[in-house]
Amino acid sequence: MEKRTTNTPKSSQEPRERRTGAAGNRMKAITIILDEHRSLAAILHGMLYLVRSIRDGRATPDFTLFGAMVYYIDAFPERFHHPKEETYLFRLLRLRHPAAGPVLDQLHAEHQAGETKIRELELALKRYEHGGATCFDAFASAVESYAAFHWSHMRTEEDDILPLAREHLTDGDWDEIDDAFAGNSDPMLGAKAGDEYEALFRRIANLAPPPIGVGPER
């Protein structure tokens, strides 16, 4: 999947928090969170690339591919990644550092808004598939809106929340967070991938044309 750097959170550019020893073990959840952010960023970049290619007349719509991408966004970040952030990282940071409350409240509201936005994206895709070219602009707008929303959200987590977590959470807190996030099954993190999600990622990569995948050019 294509990974660009413009207006995206740091996780979608270069890995970080690659530490060794006790500190590395304690902070491995941050690496997982950043890896999962990169996974979502790659899917969003892919969708934006396809939308722009269609708009420029360089590609025709592949609704199977779009459907797989939207399903990934719904199935992994919205159902697994965000709930674990809320249940473990945000809860413990709020306990250890109450001053983070306003930013955590903002992120919680964005998690809830994300569920609405993914439904809007699904609906826009269905309308485009059944309504044809007249519905393309609305679908493209939904993709661009969702991507901008999520990049802003991830940037807040990485620039504001993760530094506070590193500063204020205890070793015991990190053990709890690490155990929770280590159980995630992200299709773009091969070693921990569950069969369903790994198969989904392979399907997306095989369907997507170059340079975002290995599928046929359109």
Predicted regions and their residues:
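Small-residue-biased structural context
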Residues: E2-R4, K10, E14-R218
